[in-house]
Amino acid sequence: MLVLGLETSCDETGVALYDSERGLLADALFSQIDLHRIYGGVVPELASRDHVKRMLPLIRQVLDEAGREPSDIDALAYTAGPGLVGALLVGASCAQALAFAWGVPAVGVHHMEGHLLAPMLEEQPPAFPFVALLVSGGHTQLVRVDGIGQYQLLGESLDDAAGEAFDKTAKLMGLNYPGGPEIAKLAEQGTPGRFVFPRPMTDRPGLDFSFSGLKTFALNTWQQCRDSGDDLDQARRDIALAFQQAVVETLTIKCKRALKQTGLNSLVIAGGVSANKALREHLERMLGELKGKVFYARPRFCTDNGAMIAYAGCQRLLAGQHEDLAIKVQARWPMESLPAL
C-alpha cells in the first residue's frame, strides 16, 4: 500500500510517501520558523495561511522525487489532531479533497501517535512492549505501549510541557524562537555548578511532571543577574546549562521510575525535545545501567514531519480503518482513546 502523508498540526508543513513493502520513498518539509520568529512564537492564522501556500508544491515535490503519479496513491493519511485547529483543517481539507478526487480512502492520524511510531522508520525499530517518553512543545507524557493503539498513560505534565518551558525560558532571556535549540547551544558553553535548579516533583512518588516552577526559577535567576550587573552573555550560558540539566535529569528520573514500575527495559523517546543531545546521552547511560535500550528517530524525524504520519496512517489503513468523507479535526485528543489494532 502506497500512502501519502500530510502533517500540518502547527508550524511545519510535512509531506511523505510511505510504501508498506518498501518503506519510506520520499519526504519533504517546510518549516515556518523564520515566519514566526519575529513574533517570538507561533501565530496560528499565519501558520494556517502558510500551510495553504506550501501544501500542493510539497506534494508535487514528493511525487517527483519518488517517481510516482497521483494514480499510484492507494490512500492518504493526515494529522487530525491534536494541534492548532486552523492548521489541522488545512491538511484535513487537502487530504479529503484529494482522496475524493483520486477515489481512495483517507485516515486521520493522531499527531502524538505519529511521533511515538517515528522510531519504527529506523533500521532497528523497537519491539512491543515498551515505555515511551513523548516530549515536545505541547506534550510531556510517559506511556506504556503494548501495540499500536494499546496505550496506557503513566504520567504527564500538570502544567507546561518540557518543550514549552524551553521556549519560554529562552524568550525571557531574549533568545530567538524556537528556544530549545538556542538553550542547548548555549548550555554547551555554560559554567557547570554556577546555578543549580530544582528537579521538579522528583522528591515525591508518581510519574507526573511540572515545569512551570522551573521556568519561574529561571526568570528569577535571570533578573538577579541583570540587577547585579553580571556579564549577561555568560549568565545566559550558565542559566541555559542549569535549566537544561534540570529538565534532562527530571525526565531521566521519571523514565527510570516508569521502567521499574512496568518491568520493561525498552524506552522510546519521541517528539521535538527527543533531539536534544544531552537528553539522549542521559537516557542512554541510564538504560545501560538497567541493561536496557533506548530508541529514537533520526533528528529530522523528531520534529513534526510527514513521514511519521504516513507510517502511522499506513498501519491503520492496513487494519481497515478509514474516515468518512468529512473534515473532522480535534484540538485536544487523548491518545488512550484510539482504537487498538
UniProtKB/Swiss-Prot annotation:
Cofactor(s) the record lists: Fe(2+)
GO molecular function, one term: N(6)-L-threonylcarbamoyladenine synthase activity
Keywords associated with the record: Acyltransferase, Cytoplasm, Iron, Metal-binding, Transferase, tRNA processing
Gene name per UniProt: tsaD
UniProt cross-references to InterPro entries, sorted A to Z: ATPase_NBD, Gcp-like_dom, KAE1/TsaD, TsaD
Residues bound to Fe cation: H111, H115, D304
Matches recorded under HAMAP family: TsaD (MF_01445)
Example GO biological process: tRNA threonylcarbamoyladenosine modification
Cofactor stoichiometry and binding remark: Binds 1 Fe(2+) ion per subunit.
Compartments where found: Cytoplasm
One Pfam short name: TsaD
EC nos: 2.3.1.234
Enzymatic reactions: L-threonylcarbamoyladenylate + adenosine(37) in tRNA = N(6)-L-threonylcarbamoyladenosine(37) in tRNA + AMP + H(+)
Name the UniProt record assigns to this protein: tRNA N6-adenosine threonylcarbamoyltransferase
Keyword 4Fe-4S: no
Protein family membership: Belongs to the KAE1 / TsaD family.
Binding site for substrate: L134, V135, S136, G137, G138, D167, G180, N276
Organism annotation: Ectopseudomonas mendocina (strain ymp)
Role of this protein: Required for the formation of a threonylcarbamoyl group on adenosine at position 37 (t(6)A37) in tRNAs that read codons beginning with adenine. Is involved in the transfer of the threonylcarbamoyl moiety of threonylcarbamoyl-AMP (TC-AMP) to the N6 group of A37, together with TsaE and TsaB. TsaD likely plays a direct catalytic role in this reaction.
